[in-house]
Amino acid sequence: MSFPPPDPLPEPPATPGPYPESPQELYLDPEVLAQELAQELLGDPLDEIEGADSAGVDVAAECDLGLTLLQGPHEQRMQGLRIFCEHRDPRAVPLLLPLLSAACPILRMSAVYALGRNPSPQAVAPLLTLLAGDDNGYVRKAVAWSLGNYPDAPVLNPLIRALQVDIAAVRLWAASSLADAGGTGPAKADPAAAQLLLSLRIDSEPAVRSNSAWGLGRLYPDLVEPRQREVVESLLHTMLHDAESGVREEARLALEQLEQPAVLQQLQTLVDEGLIA
């Protein structure tokens, strides 16, 4: 799958949208944060996924080391988790699953990211439990990203729910992951698109609207014609009227990437009329 669209802890990658989430909306236990800062263990495991470069690295040896580290004390477990945010190895899954219930939210968050990199059917139920009930925004945000790697699992409705009610940091990832969860055929694409259309219209956060536009572009090929028309109309309206320039640009990019002659002609007409540059 494609990794979608900074807060000080952790920094997200920037694939689907240009906007960071709002760090003030995230909750992290101050004592845990202070401890982790002192240990210099902060940083988003997802940065490891996005920046992974295996050139010159003995992946098998790295994974063997990671398996050993996951069975060690806290600092070693954090190092092992970073390895499995970079590399895939099914042997890691039995060691990652128990960390989903760790008391430390940074361990839980890192384990969630690692299970996004190493998808397993065994992880689906505990990940969904965390999305619905974990009281830490960083953990739920990580789950919203990771579930995009489980498109064949029953993740669609939980992601829709997260996009409806959770904090902005979680909503923007839910919007991105819906493009993957809904991209397996029309039966899932339509309800995913319906929620993304709603979020594109009403969500107060530009990051979420931007990722919703991105997701609609991704889902477009799997939608029936009436829904495709609705997507085009909504993206055009957003491109012309959204208050945030970044959202307008994302909507335009989504329209251009549809590669539909009629849509491209509409865009050219708007350029000719001076309504867009």
Language model features: what each stretch is:
Residues 1-94, 98-102, 256, 276-277:
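N-terminal alpha-helical scaffold/docking segments in eukaryotic complex subunits
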Residues 85, 116, 148, 179, ...:
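Structural signature of alpha-helical solenoid repeat scaffolds
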Residues 56-70, 89-101, 120-133, 152-164, ...:
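Amphipathic alpha-helical scaffolding segments comprising HEAT/armadillo-like alpha-solenoid repeats
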Residues 63, 78, 82, 94, ...:
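Alpha-solenoid HEAT/ARM repeat scaffold
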